[in-house]
């Protein structure tokens, strides 16, 4: 595979010779395969196939359009505030916790050092063998997931949202990371163009076709949605100014993950070469079908706040989790969220220590 040649933000590439097994809290971050029971009888949402248009990923046209990390402590801490909207339209605003505040300041003042490591993670065995590393503009190496009822695919879903301004619906991809917690991209929840939240978020896990009957577990409505405050406050008229804060959380009204399972997530300080796995709902494929892709991520293309890769994506893939299969932990661990594309690569926001702490504060 030809390594990406994009210049990254001048920052440390933290890696070591050994890949550490993640240390999880009692609940947040750890994976669960679920109990295998169907959720369809408990469905709460009204899914209408065909009404949503895939949300296009933001474009990164050149490095000049990517803002450098904030270096001011107060501004950096403020960017990790929680901004949200409840299903009944109430605004939510929560200041960063003291633990998160201390972590942000610690990372902001950390010295820049590190070495390049060797291969760390393998391709997910359930995705099968496949040639990795093809460019999105080259040969399409994505494969359809035919059985979406089995874990981990039961934990991955189609996410709809409505524009209050136009009344139209858009779609993204999203992943269960807890009983009621869904991880996606912030631009799937909030529109800078409209300067407003989207609404009526609907999560359809394991969707596998173009009819309502193809939603094997039903569809589920949201209780609240959240983004990093920096995604809203730091917008300067172009996407690159908020790339680093393009993370979103949807809290569902019902416990879906106990039955269907959820993926683990973690920060690896020593993140180096690994195989990225993406599963989602690209809009260039038959409506409502789930597709998977795998590709290599090289240490030279990993920054503390994001990383880049060649995995094939398309509008609708925004919000897909980028996960690695950890052989030691025997778990699928989310390391980032697919958020943007450029002529040379696709980009994920990295789940670094601060982002993991932010997600943990919303875990349900």
Where are these regions (language model features)?
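Protease-domain processing segments flanking chymotrypsin-fold serine proteases, especially trypsin-like
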Residues: 25-176
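N-terminal signal peptide c-region/cleavage motif recognized by signal peptidases
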Residues: 20-22
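Chymotrypsin/trypsin-fold serine protease catalytic domain
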Residues: 241-316, 346-355, 360
